[in-house]
Amino acid sequence: MWLETETFQIDKNENLEVNIKIGEKLQGSNRPYIPNDVEEFYWSQNGKKFNVNSRLGDSPAFSENINDNGLTSIVYISKPSFLTYDTMEKFEKFANHKDLGPVKKLHASLGFPEKNFIETYRRFAKVIVGVGSSSGRDTNFGLLIEFILLNNPY
């Protein structure tokens, strides 16, 4: 899952639209805004944080008129999702696809069952857009997994 916009620079007072994307290798489809899936969805600019005011089914999931200059971050954190694996083989196939290493051995060493076990996962996404002068710096929002730009690309 990732956040995607058509353009990464806009003029101030212009509308910014951002889609939630589901897929792999940056190929995927748009997902509408579903509040029951969202723990946090906000945007931040110039040290201020604003909640996203989307409604069920909105696509794009984010559409906001940005009135100030500055580097702008849109952040999405999902609620936990659960996936049941009937067999270890199914889990190993997933782990190999994601290149996670020798998970079967780790799984066993932690005393987890070989059948009918549950994976809990969350999704974290952030997109950076330059608005107007695009001044400012990226911020560490404390996501469990997060890239932080060391330099402003705009």
Residue ranges and their predicted role:
Residues 1-154:
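N-terminal soluble domains immediately following signal/targeting peptides that reside
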